[in-house]
Amino acid sequence: MMNRYYLLSVIVAFNLFSIAHTQSQTRESMSRELEEVARVATVMVDGDVCQRIMTERALKKLFVIDPRDQWAGSDNFDVNPEPFIQTKKTLMRLAKLRPYPIDCNLWMLFKENPGKIQILIRNQYEMSQFWTWGVLYQEIPPEMAEVLSSGKPKTISGKGDLISVLTPVYNSLGDIVGLVEVVGRLRVNWQENVK
């Protein structure tokens, strides 16, 4: 009984610390901390593995619109489990580098459709300044295009109290094949999605 009480006390204390730490963050300090996570993400996320996440079948059907079923593309979405799980775990570990809630999302380019980008892996809090719920792929936003062309990370403080750092993902040939969006929120609203 005492062990349960002790464990519960530790969990509550950690959560209160996380909330207090997040609430006391300034935009500048959070930006610096997210930039550090983004720097590590560029080194740790393997672009070759990321390029193997989507199955060939899913990639072929993604841009084909069936006149009888406009949502068939999402029905055909499929991933190769090994590279997906490996990358998802890496992104989840990166998000634990901060003591407050952040997400590390993987955005991937398409070889066949160079003007489009896809959020391939989202994480626990589903935070993003760029993703619209339900969208399989989208035009590349200007901020992402800048990172893709320069190869340099970019910090964006746009939507409300969200701060994102976009950082490139490289394959073994040195080509940029995608981005990681490291995103946090200055003020966490734990009731935001509760209706």
Regions found by a protein language model. Give the residues of each.
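Extreme N-terminal signal-anchor transmembrane helix of membrane signaling/transducer proteins, especially
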Residues: 3-24
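Short amphipathic alpha-helical segments
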Residues: 31, 84-92
